[in-house]
Amino acid sequence: MVREEVAGSTQTLQWKCVESRVDSKRLYYGRFILSPLRKGQADTVGIALRRALLGEIEGTCITRAKFGSVPHEYSTIAGIEESVQEILLNLKEIVLRSNLYGVRDASICVKGPRYITAQDIILPPSVETVDTAQPIANLTEPIDFCIDLQIKRDRGYQTELRKNYQDGSYPIDAVSMPVRNVNYSIFSCGNGNEKHEILFLEIWTNGSLTPKEALYEASRNLIDLFLPFLHAEEEGTSFEENKNRFTPPLFTFQKRLTNLKKNKKGIPLNCIFIDQLELTSRTYNCLKRANIHTLLDLLSKTEEDLMRIDSFRMEDRKHIWDTLEKHLPIDLLKNKLSF
């Protein structure tokens, strides 16, 4: 972080992308400006955005590979230049772009001799490789080579304990961090009481999303993080004086859903997708991450199941019920639903 004194002034709070470039398929750069900010605000925004960009942005990567009958990851396979460990490291570096949630399957199946690159990966329709030239292995002999892969969207750095996988399946330490680096600098403007600050933010990504997309997602995550403080009164939360005890409001979410289930006949609930329920993007993403794709998936969950979903909050429960209450009665009148 660099702080400098510069001359100039701005009249209204605004942000702008002042520079954007693509250095390579796996390196995007963007530079943004936010101003005017009061003294100290630039540091607050800069620190929060930097942490959110580096730790809260989701990415898609390969998390597991299955080679068949391979005794351990340090084995070598006849006709392949690289060891199993080297192939796993190459797979770890593959950059993928997608908006999927949950685990998906992919594969590689080729015949040598030839070089295997990222373009040889057979991916689900919603996933694509950012750089098809990324190397995986070199087949030096005319052999058939197949790998089964697992792909997952997550955030941060995920590790698994190494074991002797007798079925030839090996975990890959997933690095779901599409933002490579973030820098910010602060410039002070004005004189006396009219002094204000300008925040410059630099973002580098791996090509799976643009710096502008990363900035948008980080900002949205920060907003979601602070929403509970804004709605605490509306939710009817209360603290008892002089007692370290929190009394949450009564919520009959599961009871109401149970009542809904009793009256449904006709169209299968697995034909109604949660995309049709007009949920907020935050609630929708939480459900998708938990592999809840249809109304049947949603109604089969208990209240405890929902609250165990990562980042799922009390407001999300209320929002889901309000949405169901708004839309389902009409559907029930026209087409009685059933499981």
UniProtKB/Swiss-Prot annotation:
UniProtKB keywords: Chloroplast, DNA-directed RNA polymerase, Nucleotidyltransferase, Plastid, Transcription, Transferase
* Reactions performed catalytically: RNA(n) + a ribonucleoside 5'-triphosphate = RNA(n+1) + diphosphate
- Ranges in coiled-coil conformation: none
Q: Which superkingdom heads the taxonomic lineage of this protein's source?
A: Eukaryota
In residue numbers, the region (Alpha C-terminal domain (alpha-CTD)) covers: 264-339
The yes or no answer to whether the keyword Transcription is present is: yes
Entries under InterPro entries matching the protein: DNA-dir_RNA_pol_insert (IPR011262), DNA-dir_RNA_pol_RpoA/D/Rpb3 (IPR011263), DNA-dir_RpoA (IPR011773), RBP11-like (IPR036603), RNAP_asu_C (IPR011260), RNApol_insert_sf (IPR036643)
Provide the E.C. number(s) assigned to this enzyme.
Answer: 2.7.7.6
An example Gene Ontology biological process: DNA-templated transcription
Name the segments for region: Alpha N-terminal domain (alpha-NTD).
1-233
Instruction: Please tell me one Gene Ontology term that the record gives under cellular component.
Output: mitochondrion
Name the enzyme's class: transferase
* Compartment annotation: Plastid, Chloroplast
Task: Specify whether Electron transport is a keyword of the entry.
Answer: no
Q: Where is this protein primarily located?
A: plastid
Gene Ontology MF terms: DNA binding; DNA-directed RNA polymerase activity; protein dimerization activity
Biological role stated in the UniProt entry: DNA-dependent RNA polymerase catalyzes the transcription of DNA into RNA using the four ribonucleoside triphosphates as substrates.
Subunit structure of this chain's protein: In plastids the minimal PEP RNA polymerase catalytic core is composed of four subunits: alpha, beta, beta', and beta''. When a (nuclear-encoded) sigma factor is associated with the core the holoenzyme is formed, which can initiate transcription.
The record's family statement is: Belongs to the RNA polymerase alpha chain family.
What does UniProt say about this protein's domains?
Answer: The N-terminal domain is essential for RNAP assembly and basal transcription, whereas the C-terminal domain is involved in interaction with transcriptional regulators and with upstream promoter elements.
Q: What is this protein called?
A: DNA-directed RNA polymerase subunit alpha
Q: What is this organism's lineage?
A: Eukaryota, Viridiplantae, Streptophyta, Embryophyta, Tracheophyta
